[in-house]
């Protein structure tokens, strides 16, 4: 798209508005060298978006939705800089039709998410949470034995890890898991032939000690783990989800954990974020064999620094006409 480098297209400095700065966790996006006006808001309600972006050429967003009606009300907008890999909050077709560029950041959190997955593998198999609690609540100091049998402990080496999804993060998890002595397999799509290098969907469910989800949320994958597919899993198996919350029917997972069929879960994402009071994800968090983290797998210092720098580069390059 043609635009004047560093200007609003009328010779004036570009107006850049960050609508949800709080999603950067205090990390600063580098500002461009080109003349500009920079405005920041920690959080923006849907009803505030149009007013705050009035006259802006650049919008910086993470979770703020930008639909066609919103874009129609912003004739000056030229760039939406998304501080994430996914751009599902933007109606990309509507943006393209209006000549608005959408630039995101791909691959910044691959190491961070993969390490979070491996952390969950260790924490669940080694009983990290219940063992810590046995010290804090006085069971160790008040007992007669030299140790506390607070939870079952399983060696990770020799377990099968089933991965659903085969992108960069899944491959990074696979490499780390193999280094720990795990048998790593990739699942094919549900109801389809497995394909080269993969096992059938149902076979991975039935034979894996741990499964980890690394696929996008689509109509096909929504609630891919439900009462029926959970019943196919190996008794006592563990489930990890650092991808999208709605990949799992959490009510069905809760029932499977309650029955003992599923041995544990590590979950970093929820269908609605932040979760609503009393929601299934918060009920699960109270269980001793479940670890819930608040969508934190991506936010290592190195990952967020890279995200901030590359978002700044996206803006600077756009203003420079690149």
List PLM regions with ranges.
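Phosphate-binding beta-alpha-beta segment of Rossmann-like dinucleotide-binding domains, i.e.
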Residues: 98, 106-160
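N-terminal glycine-/charge-rich "phosphate-binding" loop or analogous flexible N-terminal tail
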Residues: 1-56, 185
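Rossmann-like dinucleotide-binding domain for NAD(H)/NADP(H)
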Residues: 236, 242-322
